Amino acid sequence: MIYLPDTNVWSRYLRGRDEDLPLRARVEAALADCRLSAIALMELEYGAEKSPHVPAFRLRITRLKEIVPAVAPFGTVAAYHAGFVRAWLARLKPNAQPIGPYDALLAGHALSLGAVFVTGNTAEFSRVPGLAVEDWRAAVGRKLRE
């Protein structure tokens, strides 16, 4: 099984605060099956650059890239899925509520990989058709949708 953690998961993992220890343990237990989305990496890079502590954040991102088995590139299949997700949630679904552009990219990326999307933002991503979503903030991951 492949897991594609959301940017918020990687951010909390890198932060390493006490309240993030259960999440950190869960990520580390599944690290061999985790992929770092190129989209999530871009969001982490952006956060580092706008931080007042650029060198410290940069070091954390470098370490993350060293321990995650692969950075998953965003290709044409992911682009197709992301476009579908954004359009479907914006106008095709009854009572449409659009999804943010980066969230659409991440959801499309997970769909293209056949990955379980790991996020703390389950309300947003559980609306995506066909996307398996898990929340690892608790000590034991909670499967929300397949």
Locations of the language-model features?
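Generic structural signal for small/hydrophobic residues in well-ordered secondary structure
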Residues: 6-7, 44, 82, 110, ...
